[in-house]
Amino acid sequence: MKKTDWSQPLRNRLAEGYFPKMIEFINQTYQEGKIYPPENQIFRAIELTPLAQTKVIIVGQDPYPQPGKAQGLAFSYPATFKVNRPDSIVNIQKELREEGFSKEDSDLTAWAEQGVLLLNAVLTVPEFASNAHAGKIWEPLTDEIIKIASDDERPKVFILWGGFARKKAKLIDGSKHLILEAAHPSPLSASRGFFGSHPFSKTNDFLVQTGQSPIDWSK
C-alpha cells in the first residue's frame, strides 16, 4: 500500500495486528493462485483518490473475477474491452445517458481522479470465484475507509447500490452527508429502482449546494 493521506488514519483506527495479517493474506493468496486485480492495483482506489480530494464514495462488492478486467476501482472496466462488458457498467452508462451525460467507455479512472472514491468492500477475488474473499480480511479496512470519509468535515455523497452496499449506511453520518440508496445496476434489479434514480445529477446538485465543483461524469 502506497502512503497516502488515508494511511495514518487507518493505522490509528485498525487493531495493531491487522496490517501484518493483511500482508500475510496478500502474499499467501497471490502465491497460491490467480487473484485479481493485479497485486499492485489492490489499493488503487485510495491511491488515485486521496481523502483530501474525496467528494463522492461509490461502494461496490468485490472485483471482476475474469482475467484482465479488475482495475482496483469498483465497477470500472478496461476500455480496451469493447464487447461483453459487464451488465452493471452497461446499465450505469444507460442511466448516465438518461441524465444527460455521455460516457461511452467503461473505464472510470477519470472519475477517481476527480474525487470519486470507487471502493469495493472486498479488494481481491480469486479467478472465476466471485465473493470468495468476503469475510477473509478486507471488511475491517474498507469499513474504516468509509468511516474516515464520513468523519471528515467536508460534506460528501455516498452512493450505495443494492442490499450489500446499503448495509454500509450505518457507518455514515447522514446529518452531514448525502446518502443515495438505490437498487443495484445489475440486470436482476436495475429496473426495480436503479433506472430513474438519478444518482449522478443528484450528486452534482449536492456538491454545488455545498460549494464544491461538480463531477464531469462524461469523462
UniProtKB/Swiss-Prot annotation:
NCBIfam families: PRK05254.1-1, PRK05254.1-2, PRK05254.1-5, ung. HAMAP family: UDG. CDD domains: UDG-F1-like. The active site is at D62. It is found in: Cytoplasm. Keywords: Cytoplasm, DNA damage, DNA repair, Hydrolase. Its EC number is 3.2.2.27. SMART domains: UDG, UreE_C. This is Uracil-DNA glycosylase. Signal peptide: none annotated. PANTHER family: URACIL-DNA GLYCOSYLASE. It catalyses: Hydrolyzes single-stranded DNA or mismatched double-stranded DNA and polynucleotides, releasing free uracil. InterPro entries: UDG_fam1, Ura-DNA_Glyclase_AS, Uracil-DNA_glycosylase-like, Uracil-DNA_glycosylase-like_sf. The lineage of its organism: Bacteria, Bacillati, Bacillota, Bacilli, Lactobacillales. Its main location: cytoplasm. One of its GO terms (biological process) is base-excision repair, AP site formation via deaminated base removal. One of its GO terms (cellular component) is cytoplasm. It holds the Pfam family UDG. Excises uracil residues from the DNA which can arise as a result of misincorporation of dUMP residues by DNA polymerase or due to deamination of cytosine. One of its GO terms (molecular function) is uracil DNA N-glycosylase activity. Belongs to the uracil-DNA glycosylase (UDG) superfamily. UNG family. It comes from Lactococcus lactis subsp. cremoris (strain MG1363). The gene is ung.
